[in-house]
Curated annotation (Swiss-Prot):
One of its GO terms (cellular component) is cytoplasm. It is an enzyme of class 2 (transferase). Pfam families: TMP-TENI (PF02581). Disulfide bonds: none annotated. Binds 1 Mg(2+) ion per subunit. Keywords: Magnesium, Metal-binding, Thiamine biosynthesis, Transferase. One of its GO terms (molecular function) is magnesium ion binding. It comes from Fusobacterium nucleatum subsp. nucleatum (strain ATCC 25586 / DSM 15643 / BCRC 10681 / CIP 101130 / JCM 8532 / KCTC 2640 / LMG 13131 / VPI 4355). Gene3D superfamilies: Aldolase class I. Pathway: Cofactor biosynthesis; thiamine diphosphate biosynthesis; thiamine phosphate from 4-amino-2-methyl-5-diphosphomethylpyrimidine and 4-methyl-5-(2-phosphoethyl)-thiazole: step 1/1. The gene is thiE. This is Thiamine-phosphate synthase. 4-amino-2-methyl-5-(diphosphooxymethyl)pyrimidine binds at residues 38-42, 70, 109, 138. The keyword Protein biosynthesis does not apply.
Length: 206
């Protein structure tokens, strides 16, 4: 799977599943058209993160979609994921690239042109930018204005994915601005039918 083939990017949050089976939600999302899954876990032990990552990797492998780990290079290497996503407060991109070589993808969060250009220069393979519509899954996420998102897209050559409160009702606003794709958390996982949610987001984005 190539990044250029990826339109819908799922970022996980088990709480967003609202009691539905976490792994089933991921599988149904992939069936709907998700091409990248990022496992994001902030408050569990390394051992539990590792176990969870192995299960999610198995699902991704079965459907031949990309599997990304949030923040943790050790888990990324241990489960042989496809890559790691690094926020501004995570390990520096250049250090991660030095450790991972070219065997893994590196995604980076960028909220302005400077961060985006720096991420590209330091070896990031793609950028995640937001929060474009605000978000319920990150307490400290500041909203990114549409004009600023467009500037980020135009400032780099690597793929850019928008993130933050994206769902079936607002994704159409992100059409035709040069994005590679969109990331969603609750816009997919909190819906009753995850597969249908992805299909509808994809339909409204294309």
């Amino acid at each position: 799977m190539d990044l250029k083939d990826c339109k819908i990017y799922l970022v996980t949050d088990e709480k967003a599943c609202n009691g539905k089976d976490f792994y089933k939600c991921i599988e149904e999302s992939i069936k709907g058209g998700v091409k990248i899954v990022q496992l994001r876990e902030k408050n569990i032990s390394t051992k539990d993160f590792y176990k969870k990552a192995l299960k999610v990797k198995e699902i991704c492998k079965n459907y031949e979609v990309l599997f990304i780990i949030n923040d943790r290079l050790d888990i990324t290497q241990a489960v042989e994921a496809d890559g790691v996503h690094l926020g501004q407060s995570d390990m520096p991109i250049e250090k991660a690239r030095e450790i991972l070589k070219d065997k893994f993808l590196i995604g980076a969060t960028a909220r302005n042109i400077e961060e985006a250009e720096k991420a590209q220069l330091l070896g990031a393979d793609y950028i995640g930018s937001g929060a474009i519509f605000g978000t319920s899954t990150k307490d400290n996420a500041k909203r990114l204005e549409m004009e600023d998102l467009k500037k980020i897209v135009n400032s780099v050559k690597i793929p850019v994915f928008a993130i933050g409160g994206i769902n079936i009702n607002n994704v159409w606003m992100l059409k035709n601005i040069g994005l590679q794709g969109v990331c969603s958390v609750s816009g997919i996982l909190s819906e009753k039918d995850c597969k249908k949610a992805v299909e509808n987001i994809l339909k409204n984005f294309n």
